[in-house]
A protein has these predicted regions:
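Alpha-helical ds-nucleic-acid-binding substructure associated with the helix-hairpin-helix region
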Residues: 1-71
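C-terminal accessory module of base-excision DNA glycosylases/AP lyases that mediates lesion recognition
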Residues: 36, 56, 60, 75-164
Length: 164
């Protein structure tokens, strides 16, 4: 999706998203609901109601709470943003199914842990649970034959990390 979005708008930023509007976003497969959420988020940033730069100065919990105040952003999306975009070191998206299954596989559990169980399992990995999440995601994808060899020419600045 990111590649399609980038092809549509060029530099993915709030102004360019607003410039495409709903029709542009829908033309690349963004659902009506997600288009509304994206455009509302872009509008919040452009209007100054949301300053994403200030999230860096907050705790993980406060930054997550601020993001989740926005319509369409739940815990998974907030955690993914904090982990991938802001690179907070102690984010562990316990609601992520691949992370739940991957953790069960990596630590040898018979059942897939629920989010509250996964939170407890991740405590020993503090304060670098984001690194643990990336390792577990990689193991999850590798077990399923979905890890592609690294491309040394890839533009790492614009390729979002995390599972496909």
């Amino acid at each position: 999706m990111y590649r399609r979005l980038s092809a549509l708008v060029g530099d993915v930023n709030p102004e360019n998203l607003l410039g495409q509007g709903d029709a542009g976003l829908r033309s690349i497969g963004v659902t009506r609901q997600k288009s509304r959420y994206l455009l509302a988020l872009a509008d919040e940033v452009v209007s100054g109601a949301l300053d994403l730069g200030l999230l860096d100065d907050l705790t993980v919990g406060d930054a997550r709470d601020r993001l989740m105040e926005l319509k369409g952003i739940g815990a998974w999306t907030a955690d993914a943003y904090l982990l991938s975009a802001l690179r907070f070191p102690d984010v562990f998206p316990v609601g992520d199914r691949a992370l739940q299954v991957g953790t069960a596989e990596v630590v040898g559990l018979d059942t897939v842990p629920e989010p509250d169980e996964l939170e407890l399992l991740s405590v020993p990995w503090r304060p670098v649970r984001a690194a643990a999440a990336r390792i577990i995601w990689h193991a999850y994808l590798k077990r399923r034959g979905r890890v592609e060899p690294a491309d040394p020419t890839a533009d790492r600045e614009h390729t979002p990390p995390g599972p496909a």
